[in-house]
Amino acid sequence: MIRVKCLGHIGTSVGAREVELQEDIMDAAEVVERLRSLSPEADPGFTKYNTLVLVEDGEAFVPAGAKRTVRNGDNVVLIPFSHGG
Protein backbone atom coordinates (compact mmCIF):
# COMPACT_ATOMS: atom_id res chain seq x y z
CA MET A 1 0.00 0.00 0.00
CA ILE A 2 1.20 3.50 -0.87
CA ARG A 3 -0.16 6.23 1.41
CA VAL A 4 -0.73 9.60 -0.32
CA LYS A 5 -1.39 12.88 1.48
CA CYS A 6 -3.09 15.50 -0.70
CA LEU A 7 -2.46 19.15 0.17
CA GLY A 8 -4.38 22.25 -0.90
CA HIS A 9 -6.76 22.08 -3.82
CA ILE A 10 -5.57 18.54 -4.65
CA GLY A 11 -7.28 17.19 -1.53
CA THR A 12 -10.38 19.23 -2.30
CA SER A 13 -10.45 17.97 -5.87
CA VAL A 14 -9.96 14.32 -4.88
CA GLY A 15 -12.39 14.60 -1.96
CA ALA A 16 -9.90 13.30 0.62
CA ARG A 17 -6.78 14.57 2.36
CA GLU A 18 -5.31 11.05 2.50
CA VAL A 19 -5.65 8.20 0.04
CA GLU A 20 -4.28 4.66 0.23
CA LEU A 21 -3.34 3.06 -3.09
CA GLN A 22 -3.30 -0.73 -3.07
CA GLU A 23 -0.22 -1.00 -5.27
CA ASP A 24 3.19 -2.50 -4.62
CA ILE A 25 5.12 -0.31 -7.03
CA MET A 26 4.26 2.71 -9.20
CA ASP A 27 5.98 5.52 -11.00
CA ALA A 28 5.39 8.88 -9.27
CA ALA A 29 3.66 10.22 -12.39
CA GLU A 30 1.27 7.24 -12.18
CA VAL A 31 0.45 8.21 -8.59
CA VAL A 32 -0.58 11.69 -9.75
CA GLU A 33 -2.62 10.27 -12.62
CA ARG A 34 -4.34 7.75 -10.31
CA LEU A 35 -5.36 10.56 -7.96
CA ARG A 36 -6.66 12.59 -10.92
CA SER A 37 -8.84 9.62 -11.87
CA LEU A 38 -10.40 9.64 -8.38
CA SER A 39 -11.64 13.21 -8.80
CA PRO A 40 -15.26 13.68 -9.89
CA GLU A 41 -14.19 16.90 -11.67
CA ALA A 42 -13.75 16.80 -15.45
CA ASP A 43 -10.47 18.74 -15.08
CA PRO A 44 -9.11 18.36 -11.54
CA GLY A 45 -6.61 21.23 -11.99
CA PHE A 46 -3.50 19.27 -11.08
CA THR A 47 -1.25 17.22 -13.35
CA LYS A 48 2.17 15.61 -13.34
CA TYR A 49 3.41 18.94 -14.73
CA ASN A 50 2.17 21.26 -11.97
CA THR A 51 2.40 19.10 -8.85
CA LEU A 52 5.34 18.67 -6.50
CA VAL A 53 5.77 15.15 -5.16
CA LEU A 54 7.50 14.60 -1.84
CA VAL A 55 8.52 11.00 -1.19
CA GLU A 56 9.55 9.21 2.00
CA ASP A 57 13.21 10.21 1.70
CA GLY A 58 12.43 13.93 1.48
CA GLU A 59 13.11 14.26 -2.24
CA ALA A 60 10.71 16.73 -3.88
CA PHE A 61 10.27 16.83 -7.65
CA VAL A 62 7.87 17.30 -10.53
CA PRO A 63 7.08 13.80 -11.86
CA ALA A 64 6.93 14.95 -15.48
CA GLY A 65 10.62 15.84 -15.30
CA ALA A 66 11.99 13.06 -13.11
CA LYS A 67 11.57 9.31 -13.03
CA ARG A 68 10.97 8.09 -9.48
CA THR A 69 9.59 4.77 -8.30
CA VAL A 70 7.25 4.70 -5.31
CA ARG A 71 7.00 1.40 -3.44
CA ASN A 72 4.71 -0.40 -1.04
CA GLY A 73 5.03 1.25 2.38
CA ASP A 74 6.12 4.66 1.06
CA ASN A 75 4.42 7.83 2.21
CA VAL A 76 3.92 10.40 -0.54
CA VAL A 77 2.76 14.02 -0.32
CA LEU A 78 1.27 15.80 -3.34
CA ILE A 79 1.78 19.57 -3.17
CA PRO A 80 0.23 22.00 -5.68
CA PHE A 81 2.57 24.63 -7.14
CA SER A 82 0.31 27.31 -5.68
CA HIS A 83 0.82 26.07 -2.11
CA GLY A 84 1.51 29.42 -0.49
CA GLY A 85 5.15 28.97 0.48
Language model features with spans:
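Ubiquitin-like/PB1-type beta-grasp interaction modules and other compact soluble beta-rich domains
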Residues: 1-84
